[in-house]
Design a protein with these regions (language model features):
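Short amphipathic, positively biased membrane-proximal segments
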Residues: 1-195
Length: 195
């Protein structure tokens, strides 16, 4: 019985570690890569002379929405408060994504490759949110009023992620943000606001 209990504890700890590694070393890089691929698709579609600054501003809005949840997960204790903000930003991001595609439709060609990339950009934030929920299931249940007391305070992590990992994620975010700022600048120079 005792060996079974220890085995179960080790297995649960292993699942938690694997989930965290999956979030940090798979989901986040795939998300950043999809952001780069989407920018490249916009560039190939000549966005500055088609949908212009309006669509580009929508892209930066989506970056800000996803960045809020990412920064909270990177630096703050994940609890009911952080999960609630994450769920809210995910919902807003999905609505903004619908606005993005609706606006682009008829203004520029959205190729099958770009549509495929959009699939990643929509699903990867959901994957990240789901993994964060699984890792902090007690607070997810508490936030839903199912069990325990929710902690709504936004506060720094008790056990911060490594400096190297935080620096890497911030650098990736900065690089992708820079691409979309370049896109907006290119669109503004071309002077295409709303064709």
């Amino acid at each position: 019985m005792r060996d079974s209990l220890h085995s179960d504890i080790r297995r649960r700890h292993g699942v938690e570690q694997a989930t965290q590694v999956g979030l940090q070393l798979f989901v986040m890089p795939v998300w950043m890569g999809a952001g780069f691929a989407d920018w490249w698709c916009h560039r190939r579609s000549d966005i500055e002379d088609t949908a212009g600054t309006t669509e580009s501003a929508i892209h930066l809005t989506m970056m800000a929405e996803s960045s809020l949840a990412t920064l909270l997960g990177l630096f703050c204790e994940v609890n009911a408060g952080v999960l609630a903000v994450t769920y809210g930003t995910l919902a807003i991001h999905e609505l903004t994504a619908i606005l993005d595609v609706t606006y682009a439709d008829g203004r520029r060609e959205v190729t099958p490759l770009e549509q495929y990339v959009h699939g990643f950009l929509g699903r990867v934030p959901m994957m990240a949110t789901m993994l964060l929920t699984v890792l902090h299931w007690d607070q997810a249940q508490a936030a839903g009023g199912l069990r325990g007391s929710p902690d709504w305070r936004i506060r720094p992590k008790r056990r911060p992620l490594s400096r190297a990992y935080r620096a890497c994620v911030l650098a990736e975010m900065g690089a992708v943000d820079a691409l979309y700022i370049e896109e907006l600048t290119r669109c503004a120079r071309a002077g295409t606001a709303t064709p």
